[in-house]
């Protein structure tokens, strides 16, 4: 085992509630509420009912954990599976920039399901979630940009992040965490090819990551051993899944740098790679008083990661695929001033003006933007107007980034809108859930989070 893996597992084993700064605990609560809304917003939307039916067919008729979208009880495994699938559909879940990881969608489903199964408290859930974020983010940074080009990091690294969160609930020691990483890492999978075909694999990725991470933890607790150097070994994850791995990232400022607090919230209901350009275009249009009809063309200056992910989507075939179309997102921004769930579902595919605007949008690699990525996601657009002017828009921190974050009032508003979208809960129930999350540290059991 390398010194960096050992440092990480020792940190995870020793992490205690009292060591976590108050702002980090508060941000964990913020992220939890944000995740809860994302999961509930998917109720009734394809392909989530497929996962629900699978859980009903293969899982128990009852259990200690709760499936959020339908309120049914099940085992921790199947609750984690369905809740993680539903977390990653509406594209409103959080993102950590430099790891390009969506931690909430894998950490919270596994941690909540296991906490309900094990009878853990709100405080224990918070500590476990922090552990999952801190480990997952560092492993994502360790694997680097080359990993993300082919592999869906939230699927691969997410398996380990989920496993760590559950392992922390089970009070694993350093050796158990090492075995746990081995068993989670050997299951890590998830490829970007699905985007070309508008396939449903993205939800399968997160469902399996959360459930497989939980599986690894429960088996480790029962004595299953795992590879001791799964991250850096000769036939480990970096060897097979990365060309630019940096082992030092695994132990980067453990205990002083709280990576969870660097996590961004999503403001638009689309792939995060579209957000910088969307914000830059919106700012430019407001500043110059432009309408969509005033714009002849838009060139978005982006990083390579955006081209790798968004470049596969030319003419989107589904609402979900439209969330990965730069032109569609900017079309909604230009025409409606926002790219939320309502705009996507009502207009992304049906409004011909969106398609017309999409044809005006192109992406080009920008050295400044690419050099800053993934630590910073810069937004740069060049607009040619119908009357021949060339205008430039720029933002350095998209809405939702730590330096331009959402307040608790904005998070509550977002949560209510997400729940209202799917009608998964009434307004009163949504308010009660918000109150429960803000009292998370007081809860001795987590049955109320259902």
Residue map of PLM features:
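Terminal-appendage/accessory-domain detector
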Residues: 1-100, 196, 201-211, 218-450
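Hydrophobic face of alpha-helices
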Residues: 25, 29, 33, 107, ...
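Short connector loops/turns at beta-strand edges and beta->alpha or beta->beta junctions
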Residues: 87, 106-108, 113, 135, ...
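Glycine-rich, mobile lid/loop segments that gate access to catalytic sites or pores
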Residues: 115-215, 222, 227-229, 233-234
């Amino acid at each position: 085992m390398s010194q960096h893996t050992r440092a990480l597992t020792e940190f995870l084993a020793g992490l205690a509630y009292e060591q976590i700064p108050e702002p980090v605990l508060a941000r964990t609560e913020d992220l939890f509420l944000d995740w809860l809304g994302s999961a509930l917003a998917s109720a009734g939307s394809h392909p989530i009912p497929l996962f629900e039916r699978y859980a009903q067919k293969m899982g128990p008729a009852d259990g200690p954990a709760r499936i959020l979208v339908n309120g049914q009880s099940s085992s921790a495994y199947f609750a984690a599976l369905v809740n993680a699938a539903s977390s990653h559909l509406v594209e409103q879940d959080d993102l950590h920039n430099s790891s390009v990881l969506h931690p909430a969608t894998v950490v919270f489903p596994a941690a909540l399901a296991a906490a309900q199964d094990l009878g853990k408290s709100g405080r224990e859930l918070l500590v476990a979630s922090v552990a999952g974020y801190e480990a997952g983010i560092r492993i994502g940074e360790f694997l680097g940009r080359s990993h993300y080009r082919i592999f869906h990091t939230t699927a691969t690294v997410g398996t380990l992040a989920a496993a760590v969160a559950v392992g922390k609930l089970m009070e694993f020691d350093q050796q158990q965490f090492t075995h746990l990483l081995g068993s989670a890492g050997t299951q890590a999978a998830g490829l970007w090819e699905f985007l070309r075909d508008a396939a449903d694999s993205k939800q399968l990725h997160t469902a399996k990551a959360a459930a497989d991470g939980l599986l690894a933890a429960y088996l480790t607790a029962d004595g299953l051993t795992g590879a001791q150097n799964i991250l850096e070994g000769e036939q480990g994850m970096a060897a097979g899944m990365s060309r630019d791995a940096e082992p030092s990232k695994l132990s980067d400022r453990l205990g002083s740098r709280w990576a969870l607090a660097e996590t961004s919230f999503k403001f638009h209901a689309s792939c995060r790679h579209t957000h910088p350009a969307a914000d830059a275009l919106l700012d430019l249009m407001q500043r110059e008083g432009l309408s969509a009809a005033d714009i002849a063309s838009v060139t978005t200056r982006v990083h390579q990661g955006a081209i790798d992910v968004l470049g596969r989507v030319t003419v989107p075939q589904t609402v979900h695929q439209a969330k990965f179309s730069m032109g569609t997102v900017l079309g909604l921004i230009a025409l409606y001033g926002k790219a939320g769930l309502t705009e996507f579902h009502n207009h992304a595919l049906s409004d011909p003006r969106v398609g017309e605007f999409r044809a005006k949008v192109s992406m080009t690699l920008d050295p400044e933007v690419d050099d800053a990525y993934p630590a910073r996601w810069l937004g740069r657009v060049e607009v040619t107007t119908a009357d021949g002017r060339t205008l430039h828009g720029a933002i350095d921190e998209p809405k939702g980034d730590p330096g331009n974050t959402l307040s608790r009032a904005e998070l509550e508003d977002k949560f209510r809108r997400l729940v209202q979208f799917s009608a998964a809960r009434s307004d009163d129930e949504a308010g009660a859930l918000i109150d429960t999350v803000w009292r998370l540290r007081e809860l001795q059991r987590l049955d109320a989070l259902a």
